[in-house]
């Protein structure tokens, strides 16, 4: 079992591990238990009663949080013609086609999000070994393979987050920074909760949300009642 440092243990004393906190209480406590020497990310972790091995239970998607994430994203777009122009106008940090493919092949990875038009995916596919392990491959489910590249860029710049259930049935997603007001964190939490509830597979059995917790970077987990997330 990993040993925790003094600052973590001091933060953990503020959390009652035997109780469930309301959303508002949890957001305030996540801020209070943030002890990093930078503006920590507040993250939520859902443990879902799904089997990701089943195709119809692979929960994945994206949403624009009402108050953003507090993080500035660098966005690159693979597009040609009018879509390339639209991506530039929308604020993409880099736009290209074969030239951008070559640039990435030569080591360029200074970006957080990759967007592509459907026609460009054959070319982007050549970058699978580079982008795939970093979770950067464009995907229609997250709105990053689209003809409306301008909207996709705007969404990313506005604070879009992706969520995806892993092999253990867990979803981890950021909902803001420790510097956010607690009510803004709560609004972001509510938005993510709503899409996860709507994404429940028809074939999922039993209690859908088994547990949910929020925490600041390096901070202790703060548990909420999975049956009462209002």
Swiss-Prot record:
**Mind listing the UniProt keywords for this protein, alphabetically?**
Repressor, Ribonucleoprotein, Ribosomal protein, RNA-binding, rRNA-binding, Translation regulation, tRNA-binding
Q: Which GO terms describe its biological process?
A: regulation of translation; translation
The record ties this protein, via InterPro entries, to: Ribosom_uL1_bac-type, Ribosomal_uL1, Ribosomal_uL1-like, Ribosomal_uL1/biogenesis, Ribosomal_uL1_3-a/b-sand, Ribosomal_uL1_CS
Among its keywords, does the record have Repressor?
Answer: yes
Output the Pfam families linked to this UniProt entry.
Ribosomal_L1 (PF00687)
Assigned GO CC terms: large ribosomal subunit
Q: Which GO terms describe its molecular function?
A: rRNA binding; structural constituent of ribosome; tRNA binding
**HAMAP family under this entry?**
Ribosomal_uL1_B (MF_01318_B)
* Similarity comment: Belongs to the universal ribosomal protein uL1 family.
Complex formation: Part of the 50S ribosomal subunit.
Its annotated function is as follows: Binds directly to 23S rRNA. The L1 stalk is quite mobile in the ribosome, and is involved in E site tRNA release. Protein L1 is also a translational repressor protein, it controls the translation of the L11 operon by binding to its mRNA.
Supply the name of the protein.
Large ribosomal subunit protein uL1
Species? Lactobacillus gasseri (strain ATCC 33323 / DSM 20243 / BCRC 14619 / CIP 102991 / JCM 1131 / KCTC 3163 / NCIMB 11718 / NCTC 13722 / AM63)
